[in-house]
Amino acid sequence: SLVGSEMCIRDRLKEAGYATGVVGKWHLGLGDKAGEQDWNAPLPTALGDLGFDYSYIMAATADRVPCVFIENGQVANYDPDAPIYVSYQQNFPGEPTGKDNPELLYNQKPSFGHDQSIVNGISRIGYMKGGGKALWKDENIADSIVTHAIDFIKENKEKPFFMYFATNDVHVPRFPHDRFRGKNPMGVRGDAIEQFDWSVGQLMKTLDEMGLTENTL
């Protein structure tokens, strides 16, 4: 888990005047309060504390709870009518799991570890309750992170910027959007790679439109 005292590339670039952003899969921790976060309030360690001016991230990965995006230290699209509770120790009463309720899963079988809370028809690592409108839909993850990444590029086109863009596409659970399903002979993994290619293509298209391609690594 990264902590604010660790020096990383984004710190050096920020010192050099770069706008810094991170979008997508994170899984590098949210500070030293792991397991103690109140997901219904600003998180004690935001990515701003770790050197990023802007962040739109998964708390960890798509196969783990909570299945919500964190934007600048707070749950994106937070739904006050569905407060979020998370545990990696035990389930919440009445909440279905992949182990006990496999009939609720969407075309995927539970596996050891990935057999706990069911969100969007997929069993995850860990247990959660609530979320409501803040819960992501796995088939829309690529569209969501691409949209926020493009917004970051456009908002910082007039100055140097550094963006860490991490997709979840080939990481389990592979759940590409319908428009990519069946596009690759390698099955769902191949379809997820098609979706990844599209994501990179959208960012490249944006750089072209902004006239930044030749000045971007």
Where are the language model's segments positioned?
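Formylglycine-dependent sulfatase
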Residues: 1, 5-217
